[in-house]
Design a protein with these regions (language model features):
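C-terminal or late-domain output modules
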Residues: 3-8, 14, 23, 31, ...
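Short flexible/disordered coil segments
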Residues: 97-100, 124-130, 174-178, 182, ...
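Non-transmembrane alpha-helical segments in soluble domains
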Residues: 17, 75, 79, 99-102, ...
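A short, terminal or domain-edge coil/loop segment
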Residues: 86-95, 141-154, 234-250
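GST-like domain detector, emphasizing the conserved glutathione-binding G-site
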Residues: 1-141, 253-254
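GST-like fold's C-terminal all-alpha helical module
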Residues: 109-221
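A general structural signal marking secondary-structure boundaries and capping sites
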Residues: 82, 178-181, 230, 239
């Protein structure tokens, strides 16, 4: 049976939870708290790919002893490997659009949402801990870029205003794509919508002036349609804290190319 190592249903952690709920598939849930660095504990599933994945602390699928990381790949795997509704579009062009959106939003929106979430919610959590012990834990994190991402949160080295500005282009692109269309990749709800929803929905809390019914009416309508899906409600109901929107860890490294 598929095992899913996951945390609160928010951000990238939400994606496979929605997909599994849409499929109605049984799986073994392995909850871990990345803010307690449980992902670095001996015996935690890992391989070369998971250690270097762009999403850093994201969820892992374990299938037959193999570890699958990176949530856009996980979504495609689950769609093909698990019985249930087909969430991949029919046409080649719409399938291309699923992958194009995943790449664009993963690199263009994922880092922004993660940075804003960490600045607002994770930094106070880290600041309340013993500084010496915490820095000793962070010093052991490899690779260096992964360690620096945690240190940036702890040290408050996040320019929230600059990150807010970086929302403009991807949000405008989404709003334009949803003008006259219900879904992102063809006439039906698909993996593209699951992938994007997990990154866009938190902006209602993190950047309400950017994503709202007045400024982005088509995007707001799309979010509302997905909010109502039983699978999405079921995934969100898995929260242990009752506040999944406050659950953030450093995510995808920002693009080096702007």
């Amino acid at each position: 049976m598929i095992a899913l190592c996951h945390w609160e249903p928010n951000g990238v952690f939400l994606k496979p939870l929605i997909a599994l709920a849409e499929k109605g598939a049984p799986y073994n849930s392995h909850w871990f708290d990345p803010t307690a660095f449980e992902q670095f504990a001996p015996g935690f599933p890992a391989n070369a790919e998971s250690a270097l994945q762009l999403e850093r602390e994201g969820p892992l699928l374990v299938v037959g002893g193999e570890v699958l990381s990176s949530t856009s790949f996980q979504l495609e795997y689950l769609n093909e490997a698990v019985a249930g509704p087909d969430l991949f579009p029919v046409t080649a062009h719409d399938r291309y659009r699923v992958r194009a959106w995943a790449q664009y939003l993963g690199l263009g929106l994922g880092p922004v949402v993660s940075a804003l979430g960490c600045a607002r919610f994770l930094r106070p959590v880290l600041a309340a801990r013993d500084g010496g012990a915490l820095r000793a834990q962070l010093a052991a994190i490899e690779p260096l870029e992964r360690r620096h991402a945690w240190l940036a949160v702890l040290d408050g080295a996040v320019d929230e205003a600059a990150w807010q500005q970086r929302l403009a282009v991807p949000v405008a692109r989404l709003e334009k794509a949803l003008t006259g269309a219900d879904w992102l990749a063809g006439p039906a709800y698909s993996l593209a919508d699951i992938d994007a929803y997990a990154l866009v929905a938190p902006l209602r809390t993190l950047a309400p002036a950017v994503v709202n019914a007045v400024t982005t009416p088509h995007l707001a309508g799309w979010l509302a349609r997905i909010d109502e899906r039983p699978a999405v409600r079921a995934a969100l109901a898995l929260s242990r804290s009752g506040q999944p929107e406050a659950a953030w860890v450093p995510g995808t490294e920002p693009s080096r190319w702007g």
